[in-house]
UniProtKB/Swiss-Prot annotation:
Pfam families: Arg_tRNA_synt_N, DALR_1, tRNA-synt_1d. One of its GO terms (biological process) is arginyl-tRNA aminoacylation. NCBIfam families: argS (TIGR00456). It comes from Lactococcus lactis subsp. lactis (strain IL1403) (Streptococcus lactis). This is Arginine--tRNA ligase.
Amino acid sequence: MDEKQLVSQALSAAIDGVLGVEQIAAIIEKPKSSDLGDLAFPAFQLAKTLRKSPQIIAGEIAEKIDTKGFEKVIAVGPYVNFFLDKNATASEVIREVLTEGEHYGDANIGQGGNVPIDMSAPNIAKPFSIGHLRSTVIGDSIAKIYEKLGYQPIKINHLGDWGKQFGLLITAYKKYGDEATITANPIDELLKLYVKINAEAKEDPEVDEEGRQWFLKMEQGDEEALRIWKWFSDVSLIEFNRIYGKLGVSFDHFMGESFYSDKMDAIVEDLESKNLLHESKGALIVDLEKYNLNPALIKKTDGATLYITRDLATAAYRKKTFNFVKSLYVVGGEQTNHFKQLKAVLKEAGYDWSDDMVHVPFGMVTQGGKKFSTRKGHVVKLEMALDEAVDRAEKQIEAKNPNLENKEEVAKQVGVGAVKFYDLKTDRNNGYDFDLDEMVSFEGETGPYVQYAHARIQSILRKANRKVDINNISLAVSDAEAWEIVKALKEFPNVVKRAADNYEPSVIAKYAISLAQAFNKYYAHVRILEDDAQLDGRLALISATSIVLKEALRLLGVAAPENM
């Protein structure tokens, strides 16, 4: 039974049901210091009803309460403080972890419901930059977390492969491009063209107009325009898939904006049939004043569609195809207003399922405090950063363990894992500065620190070379360090649920750091392999810790090497 439930049931019985179990569970607190117990109930909540001071109420409850399952229950001022039975709790938690293994913390909350996750979405014909990392790894982690809780995540790479920028790129290719040069080095050459034509379009309205005309041709099915566009797309995907392979991220569908180009007329006609479209300066808009939003521009004066038109078609397609229980969009915080407009237009059209669409925004990655910008050519390729992280990891592994057999493979796991972990430990809505020195460090709150704790446990277990009978373990939790680990292990299922509820992988990453820290304190204070009556209990404790560390890392898309 969950410790909050245990405390709440005992309290509700002690106060004759004045507060129900759920009411009590909602106000149970954790004391600031573990010396004051594991959980605390503030008696202020009963003062008015019982017409007594909170201090008196706390004292009366502590005397009356059934202490079964607790080491002791005491009154501390206006609080009733509960100390859990350490040995019983440890036995229960460790047996549960060792029995369930990687499935510890699993739940069937989602009951198989589909959850499409719009993620990564790099732009065709542009480098896969560090700026694309967040959507990719946050989306991948949320998918793993949701799958653990019984949902069916559907990872969709909504490639940026449609829009006026491709008209401009075709313009640049026709003016300056060379097929052989681009074929030899596609992304770099296309980036040069993109930066050059954007600079020209800013200065010369005729260049901008030419780009607009080429995009219009794409929308109208012009053979030459689509042939060049498809070539850009094909060479880009080859590069992207290589990078996804390094990241260890896969997708269920690659569905770019172009996939929906023939589905937009239907959504525009639907809005028109419901009298939602209004003309404004020759363009078609949906008035969203009642939502305190600016009008949504659906079609421009020249008939070209916009980002929101394509997203309306996308949302309708996903509902029809996947019948989702939730539809997540892991897209940067700068798009918040766009998603508010998107949901509002769908709501106006009578699609209440739009309530199940969730924008999962995130903060920006900078380097040296500066924003990445492809238009200006200020771009750092993610692949180069990953390769550099792996090189740094290999040097550290060489220094720590020169005789490690599979150094190169472990270096990949540590280097790539370091970059992903650093991103995911950052609160989603916050940004961070991309700093490889900090990321790949084996000290501090980093991925390598957590991985090293897991590898250290595996090393101890190999050295012990002893099979532990989980049904016959003596677990005497006599030290504070072991108890901290037990409490952390017990909390893991709640951590997974909290991460899912808030679309927040950082909850898992921070938990993994705290569990690794708890183990390292235990390792420093306890002779784990001492041959005494408690040896099997200690091995069971660290084995359970290893299982949960590995699973926490897996939920973040980070490997857990057995050796480092």
